[in-house]
Structure formats: C-alpha cells, structure tokens
Amino acid sequence: MRVGVICFANTCRSPVAESLLVRFLAGEDGIEVFSRGVAGGPGSTPEAMLQALTQNGLSLVSVSGEQLVNDDLNADLYLFMERSILREAVVRNPSMWPKSFTMREFARRAQLNPPERDSETFAEWLAVVHSTRRREELLGTDSEDDVRDPGLGGDLEAFSAMISELELLSHRVAQLLTGWPSK
C-alpha cells in the first residue's frame, strides 16, 4: 500500500505527517508513506519547527520540497493538509478524487464507516468511505478539515500545535491502515 501525504510546499506539514505515520506504522509490512507538495521546490525547514520537533522528541524522515508528479499517481491513498490543496490536485488529476481526502476528513469518514478487514480489501473499504462524498464539497473556503499551516513565520507555539494535531491524526490514520491482508 502506498500513502501520499500532501501539503503546499512539502517543507512543514506533510514531512511531519509522513514522519509520524512512519513511526506509528513501524513493523507493518507493505506500507510505504511519502510526502509531496503541490508547489514543491527547494525549501528550508523553519527554525521554530525544528525546535518544536526536538521538544516533542521527533525527527523528520525527509524534507525535500518535492512536488507531486505523475509518478506519484499510483498511490492507494492521498492525505491532504488542506481542502484547497486537495481541490487543486484533483483538478489537475481527476483520477485522484476517489482516493484523496484531507487527513481530518479521512479520519472522520473512516470512523463512520469502520473497516471490515476479514471481508473486504483496503480498496473496497476506501470506495465505501468515498461513496458518501460529493465533488461539490471541494468548493468553497471552509477550513474545518484543514491542518493549519504555521508558515515560514510561525512561532514555536504554532508549530507545536501543528505537531500535536498531526500526531493525533496520524495515530488514527495508522490504526486504519494496519491489519489489512496482503495483496
């Protein structure tokens, strides 16, 4: 199973979520997690974020600023940090829609449709989770499902809050990704 975690520049939120998912999925065979940005490029990690990571006993698996490209379109699940970023990716690549969610949305919808690992595959379950959605939900500016971006000017408190939120979400998501039969 391939899981992509996507934010804007791939220098803050998605690398943190990737690192947390890798930590929570340690020992689980067959799951690859990667992070990308929709506007990736060389970027540096803000100093306040590095301090927040250290205070939380975390380190990053990768910080590349790498952009989402066609080679990444074979993932089984995409978890976005914001609805606007999800919308942009789906406009560029409509085939991503059934397997693309904001991280918060995925955790919420999955809780309403718990997996039945002994009677369905991950892809079948994901189709059930997706079936209650409408494309129109991508429109608008509601940020309810967004993970707030502290940005390059964010302070230690803002990055610590982001890390705490992503830790909770990553733990929930990791529980949903484990225990599936091998293909």
Q: Could you describe each region identified by the protein language model?
A:
Residues 90-183:
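Phosphate-binding/catalytic loops
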Residues 82-83, 104:
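Short secondary-structure boundary segments
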Residues 1-75, 84-98, 171, 175-183:
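Conserved active-site segments centered on acidic
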